[in-house]
Structure formats: C-alpha cells, structure tokens
C-alpha cells in the first residue's frame, strides 16, 4: 500500500530482494504499471496516490539493484525508459526532478532554485539523491548495453564534489552566484530542525553520502586516514543520527 522509496531503497529493498524475491517482482511490476498509467515511477506513493514527499529519483536504485542481483519477471526495458525520462526531461516538465536544469548545466543544484524560502531549501539533499540515482542508472545502462548513457550518468554522479567545502570540512550549500553559503553552521538541522540545503538533517548527516564513490570522497577529505578520523569524530561528538535514513550507513563506512 505504500512505496515510501526514499526510506526503503537504502536497505529494505535489498532485504526484500534476498528474502522475498517473488513479492519483490510483484512490487516492481506494480511500480512499472504506475509509470504506464501516468508517465512517472512512484517517488513517495501513499495508498495509490503520489505525495511527492522527500526528494530524488528512488525507483532507479530500487529497481536497478534488484535487476543486478538477478531478479527477472518484469520489463526492465520499460523501467529503463522511465528512468531515462526522469533523468533527462527539462525541469518545467519533470515531476520527478523539478530542479534538474541547473543539476545538468552546473553539476549541482543551487540554493533558491526550487524553494524561495531558504529555511525550506533542500538543494544539497536533492542533488545527492540525483547523484546516487544517476550512478545506479549508469550501472544499469552498462548492463543493458547503453554504453553512452552509462558514461554520461556516471560522470553526473560525481558532481557531489562541487559541494565539498575544505573550510567547513563538510558538504555545504551553494548559492545562486556559485559561492558557498556563508555564514554556515554544519550542525544546523540537528534533530530534524530546518537547515538551508538539507532535508531532515544537518550537513554532518549528509557529508559522507556518496556511497557510490567512497574512495573519491576520502580523497576530497585528504585521504582515507583523515576520512576515518572525521567519521570517528561524528560519532564521538554525537553528530550521528540513526533516527533518519541519510546517515544510517555511516557505521559501515
């Protein structure tokens, strides 16, 4: 009855694929049927109605992961068509990625493009979800023989580097003029309070969120030792928040 995909693509969908493959195939077919009915995969569906809650393009990592683990019984080419539509359609006609235009043109989503009210701006969170989705799409494209797409989407997926600020040592929102937000406190957003750039979390809850390029992120931070030291500091200072999804994988990094 609910495809709360922002919540579930990170770990629950993999568990479902491993333990309940037949039911997972049924759910994926339902998702593809939703696309056939109205042109978009579900994002955060509730009782057969799309709510557009949260951000990203979560059907991509959800279904791509299942396919790469060997699940069949659904039309992967139809799913790929849906994924490519949301990853390439211009923003004014894109229900899944309404702020895709600067994401493609600049490699990131600036503050204020999607939400004029800075307290409700989730630009960094939006872009991070797009990077991960595009990486999953790149892997699927390669598996299906779409080599040019695989290269394109992998290049996009590395755009997270735009957000890394050496000054703060975290990912940091970027303003419309291409500068890092200032003043900036990476602890803003703790305990689900509003913070410019981040949805339901602080910069510390999102800074390590490049699971598709962990070694690349470590290089940005000055190497694997500094990466690990910074991660340890997050735990030591109580900046880790397992109550929400973006940083739940931190213990496994």
Where is each model-derived feature located?
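Active-site nucleophile and cofactor-binding loops and adjacent substrate-binding regions
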Residues: 2-7, 52-55
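Active-site core of glycosidic bond-cleaving carbohydrate-active enzymes
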Residues: 4-10, 60, 73-253
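Conserved kinase catalytic-core segment
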Residues: 13
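Active-site-surrounding "flap" and adjacent substrate/cofactor-binding loops of secreted or lumenal enzymes
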Residues: 21-46, 243
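A contiguous strand-loop segment
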Residues: 34, 45-47, 57-71, 82, ...
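The substrate-binding groove and active-site-proximal loops of carbohydrate-active enzymes
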Residues: 49-53, 124-126
């Amino acid at each position: 009855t609910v495809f709360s995909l922002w919540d579930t693509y990170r770990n629950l969908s993999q568990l479902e694929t491993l333990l309940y493959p037949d039911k997972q195939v049924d759910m994926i077919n339902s998702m593809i049927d939703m696309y056939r009915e109205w042109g978009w995969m579900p994002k955060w569906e509730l009782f057969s109605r799309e709510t557009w809650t949260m951000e990203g393009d979560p059907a991509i990592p959800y279904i791509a992961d299942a396919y790469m683990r060997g699940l069949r019984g659904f039309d992967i080419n139809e799913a790929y068509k849906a994924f490519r539509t949301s990853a390439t359609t211009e923003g004014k006609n894109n229900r899944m990625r309404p702020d895709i235009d600067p994401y493609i043109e600049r490699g990131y989503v600036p503050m204020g493009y999607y939400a004029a009210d800075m307290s409700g701006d989730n630009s960094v969170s939006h872009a991070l979800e797009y990077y991960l989705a595009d990486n999953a799409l790149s892997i699927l494209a390669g598996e299906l023989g779409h080599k040019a797409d695989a290269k394109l989407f992998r290049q996009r997926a590395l755009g997270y580097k735009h957000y890394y600020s050496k000054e703060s040592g975290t990912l940091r929102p970027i303003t419309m003029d291409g500068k890092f937000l200032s003043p900036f406190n990476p602890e803003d957003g703790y305990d689900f309070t509003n913070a410019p750039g981040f949805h339901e979390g602080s910069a510390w809850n999102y800074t390590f969120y490049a699971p598709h390029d962990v070694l690349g992120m470590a290089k940005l931070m000055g190497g694997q030792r500094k990466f690990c030291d910074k991660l340890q500091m997050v735990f030591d200072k109580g900046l880790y928040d397992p109550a929400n999804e973006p940083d739940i994988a931190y213990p496994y990094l």
